[in-house]
């Protein structure tokens, strides 16, 4: 799904909605005899089966909605009532009835005969160019049906004008662009924005035609139903695309990681060795120039490009960002809990300054033997307001911190230990 030549393109064939989902519309009244043959050559278009989003290098239509010409060729090749009925039965899903053409045959005759002369201003030439484009597609089917080509071109332009003037057009456009943005490379996303900036020109192109044809058609429930179903279809398609990209991108990254681990276990060399942990800007520019030089080239063993292309780099960067976002969302609560626990322990480990000053004063006054008795500890508990466990821990940590800085206390402790050991050995001898 890529974006090419400054227009939104997407090859979508939506086969979800078939003819069996919607009951056939009521049959239109028979047309007058003088126009029956004329309108059989241009059967009513079916919205969902023929409104395909396709790319065209020579056509810059914004929505790329085209009416297929295969059904027109089939219907025009035979003038029998049975073939016309078969073509109408094949296009039952959301097909537009041609009864409004029969009810307004005088207006239609003037519109078809004069082209789109009623449209004034600069939009006249643009719509006529659109009609010429539509007519050019039908010339290769055998030719000779100029009136039918004019009707089809008029219907194409008018259908687009109705879509652009519909209240759900903005939602339809947003859903379509959202589908395009999912798998479009990062370096091509600005093209979509540039095309969206030109949407006002497309609206202005068909606004005059919509105003001219406003009196021909009243409330169109079929168009409302089509727009509603199509917006829902695009939203569902967007969710499927997102799931596809996330799942398969995760699988691809995990597969690459497993391959790297296997290579590291076989060779004993990590992927970062020999290339440096980081690269400067000059090295980045050199790599980009090398990539431009060797893009599309195969190495000696035929394992593909020597250096990843720009599209591959953008895809890897996109996957990396998606994984980073997923990891943050998955482990956000745990990370917050761990951080709060660490901060709480830090706050709990630090005693207030006034209490530590009292303990340090007692430590300095008893530096030769910094081991408080139970009476000293009880008095310190009353003076500082701390718990007995906190005072014991503070003295233990303080003795560890000053173990080598107070040789007198260590000497006294060693002598006391020796004397205690001598007394115990003497008792054992005389026992």
Swiss-Prot record:
Keywords: DNA-binding, Homeobox, Nucleus
Compositional bias per record (Polar residues), positions renumbered to this chain: 404-413
Chain residues forming the annotated DNA-binding region: 343-406
Single GO BP term: detection of cytokinin stimulus
UniProt-annotated location(s): Nucleus
Example of a GO MF term: DNA-binding transcription factor activity
SUPFAM superfamilies: Homeodomain-like
Region: Disordered, residue numbers: 15-47, 402-431
Domain ELK residues, every copy: 322-342
Quaternary state and interactors: May form heterodimeric complex with the TALE/BELL proteins. Interacts with OFP1, OFP2, OFP4, OFP12 and OFP14. Interacts with KNATM-B.
Designated name of the protein: Homeobox protein knotted-1-like 3
């Amino acid at each position: 799904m890529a974006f090419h030549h400054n227009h939104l393109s997407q090859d979508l064939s939506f086969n979800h909605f078939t003819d069996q989902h919607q009951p056939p519309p009521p049959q239109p009244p028979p047309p007058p005899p003088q126009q029956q043959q004329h309108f059989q050559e241009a059967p009513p278009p079916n919205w969902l089966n023929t409104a395909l989003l396709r790319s065209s290098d020579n056509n810059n239509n914004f929505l790329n909605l085209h009416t297929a010409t295969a059904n027109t060729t089939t219907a025009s090749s035979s003038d029998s009532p049975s073939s016309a009925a078969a073509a109408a039965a094949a296009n039952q899903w959301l097909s537009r009835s041609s009864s409004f053409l029969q009810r307004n045959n005088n207006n239609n005759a003037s519109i078809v005969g004069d082209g789109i002369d009623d449209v004034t201003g600069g939009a006249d030439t643009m719509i006529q160019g659109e009609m010429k484009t539509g007519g050019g597609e039908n010339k290769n089917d055998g030719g000779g049906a100029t009136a039918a080509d004019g009707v089809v071109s008029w219907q194409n332009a008018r259908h687009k004008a109705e879509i652009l003037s519909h209240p759900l057009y903005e939602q339809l456009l947003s859903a379509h662009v959202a589908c395009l943005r999912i798998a479009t490379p990062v370096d091509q996303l600005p093209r979509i924005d540039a095309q969206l900036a030109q949407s006002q020109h497309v609206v202005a192109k068909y606004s005059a035609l919509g105003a001219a044809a406003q009196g021909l058609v009243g409330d169109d429930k079929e168009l409302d139903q089509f727009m509603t179903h199509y917006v829902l279809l695009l939203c569902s398609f967007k969710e499927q695309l997102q799931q596809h990209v996330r799942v398969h991108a995760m699988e691809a990254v995990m597969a690459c990681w497993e391959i790297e681990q296997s290579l590291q276990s076989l060779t004993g060399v990590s992927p970062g060795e020999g290339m440096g942990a980081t690269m400067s800007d000059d090295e980045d520019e050199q790599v980009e120039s090398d990539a431009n030089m060797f893009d599309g080239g195969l190495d000696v063993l035929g394992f593909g490009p020597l250096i990843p292309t720009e599209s591959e780099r953008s895809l890897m960067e996109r996957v990396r960002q998606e994984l980073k976002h997923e990891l943050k969302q998955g482990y956000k609560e745990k990370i917050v809990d761990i951080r709060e626990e660490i901060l709480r322990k830090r706050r709990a480990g630090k005693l207030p300054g006034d209490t530590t000053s009292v303990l340090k004063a007692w430590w300095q006054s008893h530096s030769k033997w910094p081991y408080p008795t139970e009476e000293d500890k009880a008095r310190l508990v009353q003076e500082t307001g701390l718990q007995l466990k906190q005072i014991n821990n503070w003295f233990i940590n303080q003795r560890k911190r000053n173990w080598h800085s107070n040789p007198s206390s260590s000497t006294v402790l060693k002598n006391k230990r020796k004397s205690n050991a001598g007394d115990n050995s003497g008792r054992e001898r005389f026992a």
